[in-house]
Amino acid sequence: MTSSSFFKNKSNTFNQMRSGLYQGNVYHGRKKCISSTIDHSFTYPVWMALLDLDEIEAGKVPDSFWCSFSPGKLSVTKWRRSDYFGEAEESLSKSIKSLVENRTGLMIRKVWLLTNLSFLGVFNFNPVSIYYCFNSEEQLCAAVLEVSNTPWLDKRIYVLKIQHENDLVCWEKDFHVSPFMDKEHDYIWDLSTPGEKLVIHAISKRRNLEYSQIDWTSPHVSGDAPCTFISRDSIKDHPTSFVVRLDCRRVELKDAAACILSNPCMPLEAVLWIHIEALKVWWNGVSYVNPPPKSRQLGTRDALKHLLIFSIAFIVRYGVVVPVQAMKQMFCSLLLRFQTI
């Protein structure tokens, strides 16, 4: 489905509400290459929110016990302006439109945000939030990726110009995302307008460098900065080092309860999965990669914060002595009981 037909058929397809949830699975696959000595992959269930920022900022999306979008509302999951790019006093839609216009010259009419919602309005973590940007002809013309790394909790903003809906976007990696993968990689992303299904396919190609040639002192780019685009042909023969695929189906907000109950604390689970898979990679012999110069260095407070978050995530996910399914059933039962009070 093209982006223009998606807009035209919206009233019939999504009951005139563009904001909703998407539920499915995410696959991560690490390939053996220079600086990575193993193949390693995993798949986890996920759900994310797709938010029409005009609807959110106009107060058109109804709040519920399960998810809310207004300040001061109590809910299991919550959208918070402060979690995202720009000044908290400025609307997020305006911040993204200005960013894209300044970077590309494109005039943006509408912005959709794909993201994790915060747990209880207290904690949020997004490995990547994606802003889909549409022009006056209702075509997807740009995307903004707001990438967070761990454990440093830096952010990098990538502004990607999309010539055609089904084009692949290729650019150089310049942000230290993982302590078990260096920066000498290039990205290839396949982004299309979310419809009944949401599919994102991204791969990372290893640059043709010998291990001894890697510049470990190359600058680390964070925050808002231009990115370097490259042609797909220039890296087509480079080895694939990493593959990510997100495959989800749409869930209407009126049906949010079942979706959210499957994973009420999605940001905490994301932190848990990242740390568990990192431990597996480290255990299997992949070397730790120190952060590049100019990146924020970890301190004692950061280490304690991550230990606390990991501990909470582990307890919420697995319990202390209660099996995981019993723990989840008990937690979900409490939420349902609280809803009826």
Feature-to-residue mapping (PLM):
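Mature, function-bearing regions of proteins
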Residues: 2-341
